[in-house]
Amino acid sequence: LRYAFIQKMFFVHNRLFILKELNELKKNKKWFYYKKLLLEDDVGDPVRYFLYPSSSGNKINHVYHLSCLENTLNIELQKIKNIFEFGGGYGCMARIFSNINNKISYKIFDTYIVNCLQYYYLKQNGLDVGFENNKFDLINNFEKINDKVDFKNSLFIANWSLSEVPLDLRDNFVSLIGRYE
């Protein structure tokens, strides 16, 4: 995860807005829960956040977004059983959800090359990950999605990815998004 081209594509680094997000998490009544989710893994040696070295900017940013989701929609992340992530970066969000619910069914749609990076990161963190019938399934073919997705107690995640793809690919996912609970 320390290669320059990976850093440019997948990391928010030591930005000051991350400090604002971290401070919001610290003020949250669930801080002790979020604090556990923030603990960074050693796999890939992610760049640690300079003002909170037990985590990275990415992990703080993801956990902050999840706290906003919980608070805004009044949902419990632990009750989500199925997740479809459109564009999974190196696998950070999937790793966080593995710590939220170890029985989660998680699907990541991405390019094959990025799926390989996700495979390495998640496998090195001890997760059941693969391209066929795993708890963490990696998908790079749109035609295979409907066979693999369970929409009950589910969540569709797309942090930046929907804005980064061609409109025709994005349009393919619009009908899927509305089916998630």
Language-model features and meaning:
Residues 165-177:
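A short, conserved alpha-helix within the catalytic core of class I
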Residues 1-77:
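Conserved Class I S-adenosyl-L-methionine-dependent methyltransferase catalytic core
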Residues 103-132:
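Class I SAM-dependent methyltransferase SAM/SAH-binding core
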Residues 154-168:
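A short SAM/SAH-binding and catalytic strip from SAM-dependent methyltransferases
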Residues 90-101:
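Conserved SAM-binding loop of SAM-dependent methyltransferases across substrates and taxa
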Residues 78-89:
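Conserved class I S-adenosyl-L-methionine
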Residues 121-150:
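S-adenosyl-L-methionine
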